[in-house]
From Swiss-Prot:
Keyword Oxidoreductase (UniProt): no
Statement: the UniProt record of this protein carries the keyword Repeat: yes
Protein name listed in UniProt: Octapeptide-repeat protein T2
Cystine crosslinks: none
């Protein structure tokens, strides 16, 4: 009976020990699973972090490309603006050259008008001198004619005077002749 109890107690201890080992092994497995799960989660987090970093790099690259594209766009814009300003400056220079030519033509026309007025005045003065000379000649002819007329008048007068003297002398001679004849008679 005593041995039966001991065997029972032994059996009890064995079972207890077995259960204890089982529980220990279970806890061990549990811890193992926990560690494994933790490692899994760590790996997962690592992969997620890697993916996030890749996405970040992708976004960075995208932004970089976008920025580079914008930079190129700005550069093209500036280039277009330079060309536009160049063309505008060229047109402006063309307009200035045209205005310069216009001013030149205008100045030439003005100079021509000036020369024409000068020639006109010259012709006027020439005509005036011509008229003066003509009037002078006319006055000369007129004076000449008047002198001629006065000369002829004097000649006629002298002639008349001469005839008058001749007739008086003749009359006197006649009177004297008659007187002598009367005295002789």
């Amino acid at each position: 009976m005593q041995r039966g109890r001991e065997r029972e107690a032994e059996s009890q201890r064995v079972r207890e020990s077995e259960r204890q080992r089982g529980r220990e092994a279970e806890r061990q497995r549990e811890r193992q699973r926990g560690r494994e799960a933790e490692r899994q989660r760590g790996r997962e987090r690592g992969r997620e972090a890697e993916r996030e970093a890749e996405r970040q790099r992708g976004r960075e690259r995208q932004r970089g490309r976008g920025e580079a594209e914008r930079q190129r766009g700005r550069e093209r814009g500036r280039e277009v603006e330079r060309h536009r300003r160049g063309r505008e400056a060229e047109r402006q220079r063309g307009r200035e050259r045209e205005a310069e030519r216009q001013r030149g033509r205008e100045a030439e026309r003005e100079a021509e008008r000036q020369r024409e007025r000068q020639r006109e005045r010259q012709r006027g003065r020439e005509a005036e001198r011509q008229r003066g000379r003509e009037a002078e000649r006319q006055r000369g002819r007129e004076a000449e004619k008047q002198r001629g007329e006065r000369q002829r008048g004097r000649e006629v007068e002298a002639e008349a005077e001469g005839r008058g003297r001749g007739m008086r002398q003749e009359a006197e001679a006649t009177e004297q002749g008659q007187g002598q004849r009367q005295r002789q008679r």
